[in-house]
């Protein structure tokens, strides 16, 4: 399909063309916002490797009740509102990789950006959050 055919199609189908353009802009906008917030994403398998090779600190930023129902083995629970560079868990881990985990991988991005601005060099957000972890078939620990 050349440009002339594409333009003719768009002229014959203005609603469909507008919807496609709108969706494309929305996707590009969301990706730009994600990058501007500083959310370096980490796949579940890469998280396992990072913990094993570099002793990454995994912080689950969900509420305590959700954490107790199921969390990544070895993760520490720290409510999203408490994620501050001076918190004792984070102050000791400034030179380590830090991975933030939320439910679906969205709400942790703001905290990741804040930590990066505070000088934490290796901050990641688990792609897909705890839901992505489960979809990858990886185990959860229960309780505290």
Model-derived segments and their meaning:
Residues 1-46, 50-56, 64-97, 103-144:
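Rhodanese-like catalytic fold shared by cysteine-dependent sulfurtransferases
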Residues 59:
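Conserved beta/loop motifs at nucleotide-recognition and modification sites
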């Amino acid at each position: 399909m050349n440009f002339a055919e594409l333009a003719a199609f768009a002229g014959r189908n203005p609603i469909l063309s507008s919807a496609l353009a709108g969706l494309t802009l929305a996707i590009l906008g969301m990706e730009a916002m994600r990058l501007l917030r500083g959310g370096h994403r980490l796949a579940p398998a890469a998280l396992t490797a990072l913990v094993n090779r570099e002793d990454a600190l995994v912080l689950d930023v969900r509420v305590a009740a959700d954490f107790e129902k199921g969390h990544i083995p070895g993760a520490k629970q720290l409510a999203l509102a408490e994620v501050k560079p001076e918190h004792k868990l984070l102050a000791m881990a400034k030179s380590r990789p830090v991975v933030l985990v939320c439910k679906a991988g969205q709400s942790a991005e703001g905290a990741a950006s804040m930590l990066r601005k505070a000088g934490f060099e290796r901050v990641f957000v688990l792609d897909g959050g705890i839901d992505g972890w489960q979809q990858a078939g990886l185990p959860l620990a229960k309780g505290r």
